[in-house]
Amino acid sequence: MPELPEVEVVRAGLAPAVTGATILGVEVFELRSLKRHDPLAGSFESLLTGRSMQTPARRGKFLWIPLDSSPRSAIVAHLGMSGQILLRDPGTVENGLLRIRLYIEHPEHGELWVHFVDQRLFGSMAVDALVPTVDGAPAGLGTDEALLPAQVSHIARDPLDPVFDDAAFAAVLARRRSGIKRVLLDQTLISGIGNIYADESLWAARIHYDHPATALSRPRVRTLLAELRRVLGRALAEGGTSFDAQYVNVNGASGYFSRSLHVYGRQGQPCDRCGTAIVRESFMNRGSHFCPRCQRM
């Protein structure tokens, strides 16, 4: 599943192409890709056609593009397991996985097509109302507005958000008896982190994935947050993690952070720090990868 770095790469790639562009038309080829859209608010196509788009924003794994509508609304996209948002020249023939197409015109770049491609259909697009943030601060990366889509309002801030409160997160951990990885994957407590970056950050911080969150000292919490930001930042700089063709940027190119992974997917291989074989254990219907020597309980 695309995590924070992958979604941020898409957001940054979309920004110059869609900011200030007008939506000329919309085609929906797969209604299941609108599962988060409320038809009572109006049809997806009618709510978008003729609207101007503003700078894309992101919180955690959610991406949205504000519209010039009144009342305020936005296109909300979640990539799910295999979703892609691609910028295409008019006339481009996409594969059979094309679910939604936006016809847009930018004052500088001319006409473009925005394609939502999704193999496994866990992703979605929707038009949603913008609501005030709980803390009154800008909603996420890419926006100065304290407004975010209603369906994103329950999502916590992510570690790369300038407004993320380290002390408040430490207080949350102090009240949680569950393992630290379970907390990191809870998008209502801290967002944007999935299996890959949880495993990589915990390895970097030398913390076992099942270590009780409440038992982490403040210095270890500071170390964990620092490693989360370092790992996410490096992944972002390297274009995200691509194991197959399912994750690509807006131009269809893959990221290469998979070459920098220390534990994820490396079970049986030697730890880059101590040489001990990396172990994979079942966890929440997925796997946790760790070094049994560097990350002791």
From Swiss-Prot:
InterPro entries: DNA_glyclase/AP_lyase_DNA-bd, DNA_glyclase_Znf_dom_DNA_BS, Formamido-pyr_DNA_Glyclase, FPG_cat, MutM-like_N-ter, Ribosomal_uS13-like_H2TH, Znf_DNA_glyclase/AP_lyase, Znf_FPG/IleRS. DNA binds at residues 120, 176. One of its GO terms (biological process) is base-excision repair. PROSITE patterns: FPG_CAT, ZF_FPG_1, ZF_FPG_2. Binds 1 zinc ion per subunit. It holds the Pfam family Fapy_DNA_glyco. It catalyses: Hydrolysis of DNA containing ring-opened 7-methylguanine residues, releasing 2,6-diamino-4-hydroxy-5-(N-methyl)formamidopyrimidine; 2'-deoxyribonucleotide-(2'-deoxyribose 5'-phosphate)-2'-deoxyribonucleotide-DNA = a 3'-end 2'-deoxyribonucleotide-(2,3-dehydro-2,3-deoxyribose 5'-phosphate)-DNA + a 5'-end 5'-phospho-2'-deoxyribonucleoside-DNA + H(+). Its EC number is 3.2.2.23, 4.2.99.18. Its cofactor is Zn(2+). Involved in base excision repair of DNA damaged by oxidation or by mutagenic agents. Acts as a DNA glycosylase that recognizes and removes damaged bases. Has a preference for oxidized purines, such as 7,8-dihydro-8-oxoguanine (8-oxoG). Has AP (apurinic/apyrimidinic) lyase activity and introduces nicks in the DNA strand. Cleaves the DNA backbone by beta-delta elimination to generate a single-strand break at the site of the removed base with both 3'- and 5'-phosphates. Belongs to the FPG family. PANTHER family: FORMAMIDOPYRIMIDINE-DNA GLYCOSYLASE. This is Formamidopyrimidine-DNA glycosylase. The gene is mutM.
